[in-house]
Amino acid sequence: MPKRDDIQTILVIGSGPIIIGQAAEFDYAGTQACLALKEEGYRVILVNSNPATIMTDKEIADKVYIEPLTHDFIARIIRKEQPDALLPTLGGQTGLNMAIQLHDSGVLEANNVKLLGTELKSIQQAEDRELFRSLMNDLNVPVPESDIVNTVEQAFAFKDEVGYPLIVRPAFTMGGTGGGICYNDEELKEVVSNGLHYSPATQCLIEKSIAGYKEIEYEVMRDKNDNAIVVCNMENIDPVGIHTGDSIVVAPSQTLSDVEYQMLRDVSLKVIRALGIEGGCNVQLALDPHSFNYYIIEVNPRVSRSSALASKATGYPIAKLAAKIAVGLTLDEMLNPVTGTSYAAFEPTLDYVISKIPRFPFDKFEKGERELGTQMKATGEVMAIGRTYEESLLKAIRSLEYGVHHLGLPNGESFDLDYIKERISHQDDERLFFIGEAIRRGTTLEEIHNMTQIDYFFLNKFQNIINIEHELKNHPGDLDYLKYAKDYGFSDRVIAHRFGMTESEVYQLRQDNNIKPVYKMVDTCAAEFESTTPYYYGTYETENESIVTDKEKILVLGSGPIRIGQGVEFDYATVHAVWAIQNAGYEAIIVNNNPETVSTDFSISDKLYFEPLTEEDVMNIINLEQPKGVVVQFGGQTAINLADKLAKHGVKILGTTLENLNRAEDRKEFEALLHTIDVPQPKGKTATSPKEALENAREIGYPVVVRPSYVLGGRAMEIVNSDAELENYMEQAVKASPEHPVLVDRYLTGKEIEVDAISDGETVIIPGIMEHIERAGVHSGDSIAVYPPQTLSQEDIDTLEDYTIKLAKGLNIVGLINIQFVIAHDGVYVLEVNPRASRTVPFLSKITDIQMAQLAMQAIMGTRLKDLGYKQGVQPYSEGVFVKAPVFSFNKLKNVDVTLGPEMKSTGEVMGKDLTLEKALYKGLTGSGVEVKDHGTVLMTVSDKDKDEIVKIAHRLNEVGYKILATQGTAEKLKEDNIPVEVVGKIGGDDDLLTRIQNGEVQIVINTMTKGKEVERDGFQIRRTTVENGVPCLTSLDTANALTNVIESMTFSMRTM
């Protein structure tokens, strides 16, 4: 069938900022879709609020709007651009919900905009729990016993009928937001209240729990001619009860008989046909392990996290083909881009095993509730490919970057068996490693199965891994056992530990005896057809399918799984670096392990190696490919941390030299450099023991900032005010980075400034200076950044320019450098220097039209910036004001304090741009999920040190018509200044302030931290209640001040004559 010719312009809605449940997979999907539509000759308009994406580059669509993803802003774009059609199924749940709102409000009809792909009726049938249940009943497809509720009372009525446990699934949400498993009345009340709050339809499905069933997923495609295929089927190792995004997943399924596989395949195709899906779709099913009974859990009528995984697992580009199906093309007329000869209607076949393991943020949030359920908690994921299940699992484990390298915890021997079993009986992120530990101690597989309901197939595989460990220990240095262990995915590091050797000795033993991996191609067809996909994985077999060319090569290290502190920004930089390498005529090779990203799309680089980012795995590739050099500065701390290890093997690190990378990180060397170039920093010292840290802090004077060196995202960084706090910190921090010392610095309050620069060794260009709204002490990734700076004098800017050039030249930077400064009462100080790409690179690149990562890569390859027409120093400002606002996922993580400080907590970001600061801030705040209202009620409860400052904010909010509530101490201060205020009772009192928040009486909460970070403190409860009820909680008065400016700009002041 020919593609549609009744439409010319298509609007694509992106998924917005990275949050738990909606990560980089939608940048990958959206980028693919936009390029596919342009390929077919359509004009593409893209709207997305996330600047850290490849999708929002000007080259990806004909017009790109970086605006808040709200009904009003998208309606304006529709009225302005007059698109013929809207494609809603590639922007995650956000895009889907937006399309429904635009349809329901009449905007689409009023502007003659058609919906492409799956019809709205079908989307609503899949998303609306009641309609879906009704359709399944018509099809005779079993669904768990359930009820649809709109109130807590209805939920209790259903509970009385069927009893506990119950699963709560809110409608029209993603990542299981607001849902959970309930075992008692208290949990049911809390979860249903939350679920109704987060569901746009105020609707929850409550179903009898089928926890313990196998969870199976089918990723399916269908076109308008009713051609339908299964792209990939996947099995969750964890049974039903844990969100699939938090489950360890294997593809293809390993424990289904052919009868079971075909039965569930038939059901999946029957359901998508009944729904009328056109494009990609994910079907989740539950299968009784002891019979052929099954239930359908849910259907996602859109491209999802699972479809990104299925695309990377098979090589089959789901989002690209879904976009083409949406404009009328059919599966039997589109060629499979992987083979170039077979058609897209052929179902992919796998001759390898895929393992996906989620990456959780609990290294950041040690007090966060680790228990896993139906609400997703992982920030990202890793994928690994192997010829055996054991191989793919062990490769995935060592990709996680938790400091865990194998099926067990580093300190596993120290736990007693009772504790290990206790941990296994709870579903949390470390259960897999405790299972390994239990098997090592002789616990039977039957006992583990009874505790976890994990299939014996997988438990036997874990047992096999432990058996191989024993054999290695019993046969140290034996080449047959070495080769056998490599076949099953063991790393040199683990083998060395069992052999009683060093890792480098095992590496040498392998080299001397030619025990090396070969690289196999991912080709969608198990080598049935000729294929030229440059997409490879390593395994210990005989035939190598990765043909090495004569071309000069540059290898780029990716940034691994998405986590707090290292997000999609680094993937953006990686992709741009690859494009620059290709433009310069080199062969570009990527090594990465994240299935969600654009960089692991095989069409981006000349060769993609989907492998763990470890010394061993990367060196194996380097030994084969012999690149000219390796680029580490675009892959975040993951890649930087490998530089030293690779250099010891004689690998050339391109760009800033290893010596200079280390000078920026080594405290003493960096201080010596600052002294030489005359750039001041806050007084600080290095400590290698708690005793030394205390001596340093007393000498410098409290408050001090303490942090380990060589970390990203402010990991384990804290401001401490006393000996007692410091002693408590040292117990934690030395754990965070044992091989590196702790830095103790004077804490300076003042404006924080961030600068990104590019240097070729001679010329230093500064694309932009960003001013943070929150003063120093809040991590730069959690601050609102403003470009151009709004309150700096020309003298400040000249000083920042001078210091940046001195630092870049002093460190002999070739490529990118990111510097954070503080402007205190007595001048400008340098806080931190990162000799690599930073998370502000995409933001500044979008604003200034300077492709920073590409320019840096050109400098790394020897191009002079002067020859490209750039002059040294700060580049001319772009027109307008641009704001980068952080986005948090606190509503997904229980027991995590929302207070901002030097350790990063945000998962994503949005951009707001306009002609004035207030308008840009309004867009930034709105895009980040803060509903800015011109009237309402604000609750204030601040620490003593902030009481003078809160008076000014309260006065201004009162002037524009806000009602003010405050706790006793804060209220007394406001009353002294004649500000009308209502006193609210303390927690647990008669007029409990938590009740006021829960009842929806409060629109903003301003709460600053009182001493002591313990979960039990009232402040923590206030902040958590605020987040859980979807109310903006501001923990910095600078943010509160900025919000007040925005509210004032929206309203008129009311004063008597």
From Swiss-Prot:
> Which gene holds the coding sequence for this protein?
carB
Does the record's keyword annotation contain Amino-acid biosynthesis? yes
Source organism of this protein record:
Staphylococcus haemolyticus (strain JCSC1435)
Q: Where does Mg(2+) 2 bind?
A: 298, 300
The UniProt catalytic activity note for this protein reads:
hydrogencarbonate + L-glutamine + 2 ATP + H2O = carbamoyl phosphate + L-glutamate + 2 ADP + phosphate + 2 H(+)
This one is known as Carbamoyl phosphate synthase large chain
Please report which protein family the annotation says this sequence is part of: Belongs to the CarB family.
Q: Which residues bind Mn(2+) 4?
A: 832, 834
UniProt GO molecular function: ATP binding; carbamoyl-phosphate synthase (ammonia) activity; carbamoyl-phosphate synthase (glutamine-hydrolyzing) activity; metal ion binding
- Residue numbers binding ATP 1: 129, 169, 175-176, 208, 210, 215, 241-243, 284, 298
Pfam entry (one): MGS
- The MGS-like domain is annotated at 930-1057
Pathway assignment reads: Amino-acid biosynthesis; L-arginine biosynthesis; carbamoyl phosphate from bicarbonate: step 1/1; Pyrimidine metabolism; UMP biosynthesis via de novo pathway; (S)-dihydroorotate from bicarbonate: step 1/3
Q: What does this protein do?
A: Large subunit of the glutamine-dependent carbamoyl phosphate synthetase (CPSase). CPSase catalyzes the formation of carbamoyl phosphate from the ammonia moiety of glutamine, carbonate, and phosphate donated by ATP, constituting the first step of 2 biosynthetic pathways, one leading to arginine and/or urea and the other to pyrimidine nucleotides.
Q: Where on this chain does Mn(2+) 1 bind?
A: 284, 298
Q: Tell me which GO cellular component terms the UniProt record holds.
A: cytoplasm
Q: Which residue stretches belong to region Allosteric domain? A: 930-1057
Gene3D superfamilies noted in UniProt: 3.40.50.20, ATP-grasp fold, A domain, ATP-grasp fold, B domain, Carbamoyl-phosphate synthetase, large subunit oligomerisation domain, Methylglyoxal synthase-like domain
Carboxyphosphate synthetic domain as annotated region, ranges: 1-401
Record domain ATP-grasp: where: 133-327, 671-861
Q: Cofactor binding mode, per the note?
A: Binds 4 Mg(2+) or Mn(2+) ions per subunit.
Biological process terms in GO annotation: 'de novo' UMP biosynthetic process; glutamine metabolic process; L-arginine biosynthetic process
Tell me which UniProt keywords the record has, alphabetically. Amino-acid biosynthesis, Arginine biosynthesis, ATP-binding, Ligase, Magnesium, Manganese, Metal-binding, Nucleotide-binding, Pyrimidine biosynthesis, Repeat
EC assignment: 6.3.4.16, 6.3.5.5
Residues that hold Mn(2+) 2 according to the record:
298, 300
Give the residues the record marks as binding Mn(2+) 3.
820, 832
